Amino acid sequence: MPTRDVLIVGAGPTGLVLALWLARLGVKPRLIDKTAEPGTTSRALAVHARTLELYRQLDLAQVVLERGHKVPAIRLWVKGEPRARIDFEEIASDLTPYSFLQIFPQDENERLLIARLEELGVSVERRTELIGYRDEGDRAVAHLRLPDGRDETWEAAYIAGCDGAHSIVRQTMGMEFPGGTYRQLFYVADVQASGPALDGELRHTLPIDRLRKPRIDHRR
């Protein structure tokens, strides 16, 4: 029966980063994903300070900074009028070298991670699905569905469930996924807009009449 130390299920940002960390530490994982190709839309846009700090250890932070867009502050609007401005550098400049919000779309992030993994000899096995697995105590035996429809049994010391909200890894373990669904309907669109040039800051419109500006003490 084929084996490898770690089987990673799911090749989104979480699975890709885990695979990259392991590969750099000398552990070559097997990385599978049931989709035919990586994402082609932006989806999640923001890379936060802690992620950039971790990316710096993987020699990725500078690339993300060069390819993305730095957002130094956010402006809050109510009914078409500006009400408040939150300066990220003012809040966290003494806590991190990345005291800003970095815009770097998820699809570009995934392509960057995939390219770095391939440099280390790890590739994503697409259209390969985890059907189930059983825990043998000192190892896990995974049942996989391959792209050609054949089934494969694979043994690993660890299985990492990076397969999202409907994770079969988590379901097999009997673990719940607490939380709820927003009642509101949200749209995410990638568009090229025209109009007055913005100053590079993020703008957020709030559907409320009154806005209280909170006092933020980042020393606590």
Sequence positions of predicted segments:
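Conserved FAD-binding catalytic core of PHBH/FMO-like flavoproteins
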Residues: A115, Y158, C162-R220
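N-terminal Rossmann-like FAD-binding beta1-loop-alpha1 element of flavoenzymes
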Residues: T3-L31
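Residues in the short beta-alpha loop(s) of Rossmann-like NAD(P)-binding domains
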Residues: T35
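A conserved short coil-to-beta-strand element within the FAD-binding core of flavoproteins
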Residues: R126-A140
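Core beta-strand elements of the Rossmann-like FAD/NAD(P) dinucleotide-binding domain
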Residues: P2-R4, D148-Y158
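Residue-level detector of alpha-helix initiation sites
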Residues: G12-P13, P38, G164
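Conserved structural-core and active-site-/substrate-pathway-adjacent residues in large, well-folded domains
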Residues: I8, A19, Y55, N109-L113, ...
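Active-site-adjacent segment of FAD-dependent monooxygenases/related oxidoreductases
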Residues: T40-L120, R134
